[in-house]
Design a protein with these regions (language model features):
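Active-site-proximal binding-pocket segments
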Residues: 144-203
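Active-site SXXK
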Residues: 4, 21-47, 75, 122-126, ...
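Peripheral terminal and inter-domain segments
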Residues: 291-442
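Active-site Gly/Thr loop motif
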Residues: 152, 199-257
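A short, well-structured edge-of-sheet supersecondary motif
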Residues: 1-15, 251-254
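Active-site-proximal alpha-helical segments within enzyme catalytic domains
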Residues: 118-125, 164-187, 242-259, 275
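Structured C-terminal helix/loop/strand segments within mature extracytoplasmic catalytic/sensor domains
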Residues: 238-309
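Active-site helix/loop module of the DD-peptidase/beta-lactamase fold
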Residues: 22, 41-80, 101, 130-166, ...
């Protein structure tokens, strides 16, 4: 989007402009705006101590000294007292409580250390002080009036509290709307929705990240739950390539949803493509009309689909292995047996995996996607398979639901033996689909 007009827009089927996508840490920026609104209402002050709002969550032995020093402003800056997300510790069910019962490592308000549990606590604070969920509170502040998706929502933790650090499911246009509000210092269409001074501070440098973060784009600094970028820009950033980027000097927005999990440097590639191919090519002059180029762009945008794996759709081994049951060695994945079926007529197949929960059947297409609901998880998926080598079939399963990620299941056949390679890139789920083991046909 540039100068208030969408220049190009494309979605990869089955996604479309109304599809909800997991936005991961972009949720944090929404929590930040809600905190700013609560401060404007006088329901909190940024320099308040967070422990004062959660006395019921403090350890029985007493509040930790460094935790007691922590302010809401420190949390917004990601300068907390923890070095990692506390609710990911083993056995935790009370996510908010874990933030206060986990022993802190350092004085807060000093150094940047990315901590999703901190923002989760801020989200819980929004619910506590507003009496509403995070999104409902922001809807009351203007998101509904501006056309934010009615079915957008935030997933909840085991206690039923919205996951303020990572749980939002919304459309690309929803994220563009929030970014337009942030660009306008909280105002849009001549009306002030969020507090101006707060929004200006939120997109300004509050924390240095240069020595802490691992990718170049994340080394440019941090505001109040908003990242800074090269060339004076700022971005709402969610894991795997969820980006809402705005660069003032070119007045350009870029919104992306993606799944770069499991691809080292994948998100940086998106940034680099934008800087190298789009940002650097923009100048103040309008381009001359070019109908051919325009039509080619439209055709390209309308033809996108989620990728499928490539390779050969057939193998000389198929007749020997189809429908045979392979009994698996004892393994960490809990898989007891595997059966593969490939239909040469329909170019589809299914994999039957017997584990501790019964038989899980995964349908797939050969070099094309088949869609279904993943057994045991009730999540939509797209799956394709290809013979990457004559004796090696690889199945790629894309989770395209409130969870986002990939599962890879590789089947290597050698005489009467089958070796299975499973790898998952879905956060916190599908742990039983990660490992290597072998089996033998009956």
């Amino acid at each position: 989007m540039r100068h208030g007009k969408i220049c190009a827009e494309t979605y990869y089927a089955p996604y479309n402009k109304d599809s909800l996508h997991r936005m991961f840490s972009i949720t944090k920026s929404f929590v930040s705006m809600a905190i700013g609104c609560l401060a404007e209402e006088g329901k909190l002050k940024l320099d308040d101590k967070i422990v004062d709002y959660f006395p019921e969550k403090q350890p029985e032995s007493g509040t930790y000294k460094y935790t007691a020093m922590l302010t809401i402003r420190d949390m917004l800056k990601m300068k907390t007292c923890h070095t990692k997300t506390t609710y990911k510790n083993p056995g935790v069910t009370d996510w908010v409580g874990s933030f206060f019962t986990t022993k802190p490592t350092h004085v807060p308000g000093t150094v940047f250390s990315y901590d999703t549990s901190s923002t989760h606590v801020l989200g819980a604070l929004v619910e506590k002080l507003s009496g509403m969920t995070i999104l409902d509170y922001l809807r009351s502040k203007g998101l509904d009036e501006l056309g934010f998706s009615k079915d957008a929502h935030i997933l909840t933790d085991p206690q039923g509290i919205e996951m303020g650090g990572s749980g939002m499911c919304a459309s690309s246009r929803d994220i563009l709307l929030m970014m337009m509000l942030i660009k306008g210092d909280g105002a849009l269409n001549g009306r002030q929705y969020f507090p101006k001074d707060y929004v200006k501070a939120a997109k300004s440098l509050q924390s240095d990240t240069y020595g802490k973060q691992g990718t170049f784009e994340e080394m440019q600094g941090y505001g109040y739950q908003i990242w800074l970028t090269r060339n004076g820009g700022y971005v709402l950033f969610g894991m795997g390539g969820q980006l809402a980027l705005y660069v003032p000097d070119k007045d350009i927005f870029m919104i992306t949803t993606a799944d770069a999990q499991g691809r080292q440097g994948g998100v940086q590639l998106i940034y680099d493509a934008f800087w190298d191919e789009i940002y650097s090519a923009i100048d103040s002059d309008s381009l001359p009309e070019n109908k051919k180029a325009h039509d080619e762009l439209i055709k390209y945008c309308e033809s996108r689909t989620v990728m499928n794996i490539t390779g050969s759709s057939t193998s000389s081994l198929e007749c020997d292995i189809t429908d045979k049951i392979y009994i698996c060695d004892e393994n960490a994945c809990g898989v007891k047996s595997i059966q593969l079926n490939i239909d040469k007529t329909t170019h589809t197949g299914h994999l039957s995996i017997k584990n501790n929960d019964g038989i899980q059947v995964i349908d797939f297409g050969m070099c094309t996607n088949e869609y279904g609901i993943f057994p045991g998880y009730d999540l939509e998926y797209a799956a394709s398979a290809a013979w990457r080598m004559e004796d090696y079939l690889l199945i790629k399963i894309q989770i395209i639901d409130s969870a986002v990620g990939n599962l890879y299941i590789g089947l290597s056949f050698k005489d009467s033996y089958l070796t299975v390679m499973m790898r998952k890139t879905v956060e916190d789920l599908f742990n039983e689909y990660d490992g290597i083991f072998s089996g033998r046909t009956m």
